[in-house]
Regions:
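Glycine-rich phosphate-binding loops of nucleotide-dependent enzymes
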Residues: 2-185
Length: 185
């Protein structure tokens, strides 16, 4: 396991309407590690995820990415810091292909037109690199839940994220799909 620290939080706090839901949360994640946040309902798992990914702002504390202090006030700040998130509710468009979904909103362009050939090549390279059972031209509507989750992962990885956060990634998966997802990770 690498000693390279990707994320560090120090004493992160958050309150809603005067009720403290996070108090002095310290977290360290190194390159190549996989972590699970576990706890009872209301323990603050989703809140810390939402702070790290820019959905919520913290009330106090510090966040460091690659040893550098960062201020994350929104999702754009998180993305700029190299943080990608996959929420329980997938954000794929079923009527589009795997490639179209992965590049939706940040298409590669050649003079005046989307560079479909290059986007497809990059998606195939990602599929090959991670060993996912996907085809770049396959319609998302035809994919099973595990394959859709893999498509979301590829979408996040296509941005060259340093840190990938998955919020309850197995909630809607069968036992075999969950196993396939864990093998991939």
């Amino acid at each position: 396991m690498s000693e390279e620290l990707i994320l560090r939080t120090e004493n992160v706090c958050k309150s809603f309407n005067g009720i403290q839901v996070l108090k002095n949360v310290n977290l360290e994640i190194r390159k190549g590690e996989i972590h699970a946040l576990m706890g009872e309902n209301g323990a603050g798992k989703s809140t810390i995820i939402k702070i790290i990914t820019g959905v919520y702002t913290k009330d106090d504390g510090e966040i460091y990415i690659d040893g550098q202090h960062v201020v994350i006030n929104n999702r754009h700040d998180a993305a700029e810091a190299g943080i990608s998130v996959i929420y329980q509710e997938l954000s794929l468009v079923p009527e589009l292909t795997v490639t179209e979904n992965i590049f939706l909103g940040h298409e590669l362009m050649k003079p005046g037109l989307p560079d479909k050939k290059e986007m497809r090549r990059q998606v195939q390279a990602l599929i090959d690199r991670y060993g996912f059972l996907l085809h770049p031209d396959e319609m998302v509507a035809t994919l099973g839940m595990a394959q859709r989750q893999m498509c979301e992962i590829l979408k996040a990885l296509s941005t060259e994220a340093k840190l990938l956060i998955m919020d309850e990634p197995t909630t809607s998966l069968s036992a075999s799909e969950t196993e396939q997802l864990f093998v991939t990770m």
